[in-house]
């Protein structure tokens, strides 16, 4: 007998090619880890598999990207599992073949007895388990002002630094990245900053190889910057010498316009944009942690006719980031704003100051945007709806109590929609865990696309669970394309072409 179906990625319903799918007669969970499969097959370009030669009985089914070739699951390998018991069976069926007398009239309908095997619609959703094993991966110190420590996984534990050739008290500002697995330590100004080599005992949480439990470990670190103060001073001297030579050439031409020697300023990163959505805000990412911000030196003005008037705003640091700040304001559609930041409005931790910056900000009118209003009856407020432009997430909204998700102020374009059921309420999609018997959080795609036009609202009811997963993801978004099947005729043509 046969068992057939599909393997899709649990995160984006992408067909999984070349994945091993196997059956176990042993129904214990441990069989997937300890025993090789009894019967196996591999998926094709559409993610479809067909396991043949299956004896009658009860089975558990799994999918596995078998990296080590032992037909068993090992941590780090892509997997999929089902709690359903697979019972292969043969079903007597009839195939109808129509014989035509001519192009208009049917001669006979031939009925041919066939045997169909079930189940043939198994859907396995694959994922790679989140890596919980935490190790110190590497350290990095490019410049004297900071050093960075990389881990393989995040931890709520705060590492402890004990200086071996310096006093560690109030010596650093700690910054974590968004995923929590990389820590950056900014050195506070003082004698420590002038010290090329930092020697420390670094105590952190790691995972014991034998038990898999979290333990505390202390490593001795010796950190030397790649670019020392001496090298930096040499570079600046070379830049100044180059500038002075260029100034002499300008003077010979009678050009005295640029008399200010090069100076290093605090930068804002990707910050200021000329056009902003009414739902957007202005983001700053400073080149070093700000030590002082004078909000009185920030001026946001709304243009009325030919005059500007002050507009209220609020400048706040992003929750977990030392460098990132956001300027919030009530952006009115169809209006023009001007943001001016005076020189020295922001002073960095190491004394750098910003230069004066002025940026015009245009807020397009409401009729230049479209809107999309979705009603999704078969999900609740745990669902998070993502609006996609291609595979890029443009916007996300949690389903409200009315089973709706509303997207305002959309730019003209083609959009797709997917949702995931945020079972643990952390606001992001999470993979499953085989040891806990937990599947990855459910993902659904709307099979249609939405062409958003200016000054146009789209209202659509979408039953997320109506179609099987294999029919949900729009073809335009599927990256894995099945190669055309080779036929004897095409092979002969290829051989003939090769001989030429």
Label the model's feature ranges.
Residues 1-500:
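N-terminal targeting or signal-anchor segments and their processing/structural boundaries
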